[in-house]
Amino acid sequence: MNKGKTIFSQIMSLIPERDFKTCVDRYKVNYRARNFSCKDQFLVMSYAQLTGRDSLRDIENCLTALSSKLYHCGISYAVPRNTLAKANEKRDWHIYKDFADVLLKKVRPLYAKDKFRLDLDNMVYAFDSSTISLCLKLCPWAKFRKNKGGIKMHTLVDLRGNLPVSVYLTSASVNDVKALDNLYIEPSAIYLMDRGYVDFNRLFKLITKKNAFFVTRAKDNMLFEVVSEAEVDKSTGIISDERIKLTGLHTAKWYSEELRMVTYEDYATNKVYRFLTNNMEYEALTISELYRERWNVELYFKWIKQHLHIKSFYGTSENAIYLQIWIAICTYLLLAYAKKVMHIDQSLHTISKNVGLFLTDKTPLNDLFNKAVPTEETEDWLYPSLFSPDDF
């Protein structure tokens, strides 16, 4: 099926054309486009992100140099940077947000049976935010401090497959806890989050009352009393497993039910952590291991920023930046889609890290990664000796 196709066209062939057209038609965009459609824009932006282009001029130069191969990648022509800049400024970023929702509905079921590291029946999600810094002089709309600009990307990640289930883009000045109001909470699901999201009023109303669970870290100034304490095996690192009640003036009213606090010492670093949860059933060690899984959302943010080049933007308006982020998320989901439907054994991290080097090759994608790409420990051969893999 993929014989004779470039790696890039194999990935982009997974785009559901009818659904993409529906997203475009919803915002009545293409009727104004002459020689550069929304599909053309998506392909060019995805190619630029996968190959790490750092400016509009760099994109133009790259496409010009590859002009003889563009047709085989599905790209019509070497689009001038001014044309791309105008499209990024004018075309509604919601097109690509809606398309990301379409892709997620197609991709997520493919990962539903993936094994989670912990043997749990519950769905497990990690929720976190990442601040993306912007130049205040170029992006005055993104001001959040006197001399700084930026936006926040609040993301809920399904840890079976590390897929972004929900993404909210806000000003960097927006408090993290307010993003909880946008979440759809699934009964019985477990939500992992850092202590920046500890708002007992919200945790009780949005999660506990909906029969879902949370695991977070207790703040140092939390006021509470111990109701009971369970026996623990301290050789596992668990120091204590306590039932507590909040005693703060407001917190005692906001969250009147008992909570569970598991205190854990990491022997490797000698650091002590206090984990807070409303789950009374799982073993104390499972609670601490669950919180460790929250770092998967950090890996997702690192991937999005480094491997899809969100650290360099191709426009300065709010629309252009939001558009680039959503196309990056769509590209991530297409890679996740390709991994499953093309039966690729390598991790998404390995695929994304290396695929940009081979986009114009005509090797079947699954052959490239299942036979040629080594493991994480031995993949240095893919990079020129002048560079370290950490630079990419």
Mark where each language-model region is.
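Single, function-defining residue in the core of a domain
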Residues: M1-D58, C62, R91, D98-V102, ...
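Short active-site-adjacent helix-start/loop capping segments
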Residues: G52-S55, S67-H72, K86, L134-C135
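A short glycine/small-residue-enriched secondary-structure motif
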Residues: D58-S67, I75-N82
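Major-groove recognition helix of helix-turn-helix-like DNA-binding domains
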Residues: H72-R91, D101
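Extended Lys/Arg-rich, glycine-bearing segments that form polyanion-binding/interaction patches
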Residues: L110-Y111
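A glycine- and small-aliphatic-rich helix-loop capping segment at beta-alpha/alpha-beta transitions
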Residues: A142
